[in-house]
Amino acid sequence: MTKLTVKALSEDIGTPVDRLLQQFSDAGINKKDGDSVSEGEKQSLLIHLKKEHGSADESASPTRLTLQRKTRSTLSVAGSGGKSKDVQVEVRKKRTYVKASTLEEEKKTEQMKVEAGDKAKRDAEEAAVRELEQKAKREAEEKAKREAEAEVKVKRDAEQTAKRTKTEKAKKEMTTKNDQAKTEADELKLRQETEATRKAEAEAAKLVEDARKLAEENEGRWKEEEQKKTAAEKTADYHVTTSTHAREAEDAADRKDEQQPRRRKKKAKAAPVERGGRNQRGGRNRKPQVNKPTSMQHGFDKSATVAKQDVAIGETIIVSELANKMSVKATEVIKVMMKMGAMATINQVIDQETAALVAEEMGHKVVLRKENELEEAVLSDRDNSATVEGRAPVVTIMGHVDHGKTSTLDYIRRAHVADAEAGGITQHIGAYHVETDNGMITFLDTPGHAAFTAMRARGAQATDIVVLVVAADDGVMPQTIEAIQHAKAAGVPLIVAVNKIDKEGANPDNVKNELAQYDIIPEEWGGENMFVHISAKQGTNIEGLLEAILLQSEVLELTAVKEGMASGVVVESRLDKGRGPVATVLVQSGTLHKGDIVLCGQEYGRVRAMRDENGKDIDSAGPSIPVEILGLSGVPASGDEATVVRDERKAREVANYRQGKFRDVKLARQQKAKLENMFANMEAGEVAECNVVLKADVQGSVEAIADSLRKLSTDEVKVNIVGSGVGGITETDATLAAASNAILLGFNVRADTSARRTIENENLDLRYYSIIYQLIDEVKQAMGGMLAPEFRQEIIGLAQVREVFKSPKIGAVAGCMVTEGTIKRNNPIRVLRDNIVIYEGELESLRRFKDDMPEVKNGYECGIGVKNYNDVRVGDQIEVFEIVEIQRTLD
């Protein structure tokens, strides 16, 4: 029997050898890798490990055992119609065995409970006795206190009697003084009343005089107005029509009415009480009284004008709602919009600017309403302290693909990040912070491929310093130029790291000359940019790069509020299958704590967990620290601002408002009914569409791939992304792809079981990718297959007409000599005269010595009959060609 060594034991239990040797040492057993291990030593190690983890022998053994038994049998039961049927009978038994030591412990527990009850009873009796003694003591103290109070009361009554006598004497003296003061006050009051009466009479006389003057003025004005009214009535035109004959007839009727004597008006009789029957009074055929028609003319003449009012307009508004606010019909609003060059429907959403122009055009005053008042109130309710402290710099590593960005950061972190990425290229932003001898630095590693322009731009917005990595043997490349542009647009200082100086053919001076063309001037040339020569593979001068970064950060004097509610930016986000939405947030100010309520763009939630870039759980994160947070309601967009708020309810309201605002603005931009887009929409039906459903692992990759695919669209083939998102491919995605006839693309994600079943049933095209180059190339190939094929004409034969014969059946027959290629019977032809095409058609007959031939080769004579053409002459050339289909590809 072979001996069991320490190394073999470590492999069996799945533990590193170093850790197993340490455990043996802790147990008091000294071993090496090749030493054998006996059964006793293994038992000793096991007992030591159990003690170390807090599990004793007794606690490890089970105290209760439950056995379950299941028995199945078939019972035949007589049914209707004399037939019997089998019934499955299942009997389940359950039996529990309890360890004897456990029963003894339970008995001890019961006995301890009884003893505890007796003890509590004795304690209660003793407490009652003590309470009686204390009660008697309190009664004695109260009795003594009452006697002392009685003595004090007698003494106080005597003092009050003496004081009362003294007060009555003083009161009599005060009464005499008050009587004298009252007499003087009465005299003063009488004088004041006399003066007030005199003033009132003077004011009344003045009012009477003013009223008389006003009455005289009104009487004169009223007489003048009456005279004007009389003159106006004489010259007024009361005719209701413009017709001359109608006016004359109306004047004659008026004169006739004026000549008739006026009758006295009779008093109106009370209305008769209605009776049952057909009529109120009289017979069955009594006609109802019909009132005389009255004139349709108004009693006054006033032009109707629309009331001008203030119109409050939000960021988006429906056409019908705008019409209601202006108190006009929606058709009037649509007419005004059509005059202004925009075509709209009654239920269409228009933006604030368009609505304001329409309202002003119709003469109303516009009030632009701010709909984000709640959002501003929530974001402004913060308790950040006014004190600021220094913070670590946020550094973004940029450069062309394969120039060594991740390798540089890899050497700094002493980790191999590049190996984890597919193809050795960075697919999404990585955020890390490292501790150096001179302080902490936070790094953002951005991809260098052209498809990740948007991600690189986001990195530049959230950074303080940009480190541009340029390979010394490759020089300035397209993505290097883009990185320079992003850094300049963000106003961020740039440090150039010239990498791969250890390779043959490295030319750092050439890199400086190329970068100088883009205003990146080294300090030794009198510029402002620091150049550091490094080798990420060998680790050459990496410390010099860190010193340059820290020196630049000292010049910038970076500060931030450390205490208070945190705010930051979402660097990356994804949907994790086990943890839900996960967002990488770079804290920019304040301190983010576990349990805080965070508002991220259109999403919100409470931070359930926080992890650093190494996957360790942390409880708080200060400025310039990147963390992964869990607990959001959905996947936020990369670049959204993350802010800690006080109230979760208000955060939900703000998130819902932002979602509705995003939806309304999106609808307002989709003006498909505009007049200028009408013909473009009609022509859009002729363009072939390549529908795509895209799913990726992180939000940044979704945006980058979608942007690259849209750029592949041409005038003939258009890439239409019908659906995109973060996370695995679900059954919903597969159903959407089947309904829209789309292909499914998964980038670093896989389809679940239900989705695979739907894909197989619908025979969908599903493709997985881990490198973006392959995805873009294959989609480009698929789009090339959708292009309309190109047809080319290739000449396969040429015949010279030597003689022309007449045939009663065919007509003109050309006797020809084949000079080039082969003449085939079923191919189209052209007739050329003086190298000019005069006819294009097909052959009717091809003969040689009266025999029909399928083809005639070069150097032979033949007779050719041209279908529907008889004007063949000697010297003409007959050209035979075929149409070849050429498959097109996207450039």
Curated annotation (Swiss-Prot):
Keywords: Cytoplasm, GTP-binding, Initiation factor, Nucleotide-binding, Protein biosynthesis
Family: Belongs to the TRAFAC class translation factor GTPase superfamily. Classic translation factor GTPase family. IF-2 subfamily.
Stretches for region G2: 424-428
Gene3D superfamilies (alphabetical): P-loop containing nucleotide triphosphate hydrolases, Putative DNA-binding domain, N-terminal subdomain of bacterial translation initiation factor IF2, Translation factors, Translation initiation factor IF- 2, domain 3
Gene Ontology cellular component terms for the protein in this record: cytosol
UniProt name for this protein: Translation initiation factor IF-2
Residue segments, region Disordered: 50-303
Gene that this sequence comes from: infB
Region of interest: G3: 445-448
Principal place of residence: cytoplasm
Domain tr-type G as annotated: residue spans: 390-559
Binding residue positions for GTP: 399-406, 445-449, 499-502
Family matches, as InterPro entries: DNA-bd_dom_put_sf (IPR009061), EF-G-like_DII (IPR053905), EFTu-like_2 (IPR004161), IF2_assoc_dom_bac (IPR013575), IF2_II (IPR044145), IF2_N (IPR006847), P-loop_NTPase (IPR027417), Small_GTP-bd (IPR005225)
Organism: Aliivibrio salmonicida (strain LFI1238) (Vibrio salmonicida (strain LFI1238))
Subcellular location: Cytoplasm
Region of interest called G4, as start-end residue ranges on this chain: 499-502
A molecular function GO annotation: GTPase activity
Pfam families associated with the record: EF-G_D2, GTP_EFTU, GTP_EFTU_D2, IF-2, IF2_assoc, IF2_N
Skewed-composition ranges (Basic and acidic residues): 102-237, 245-261
Renumbered residue ranges of the record's region G5: 535-537
Function as written in the Swiss-Prot or TrEMBL entry: One of the essential components for the initiation of protein synthesis. Protects formylmethionyl-tRNA from spontaneous hydrolysis and promotes its binding to the 30S ribosomal subunits. Also involved in the hydrolysis of GTP during the formation of the 70S ribosomal complex.
G1: annotated span: 399-406
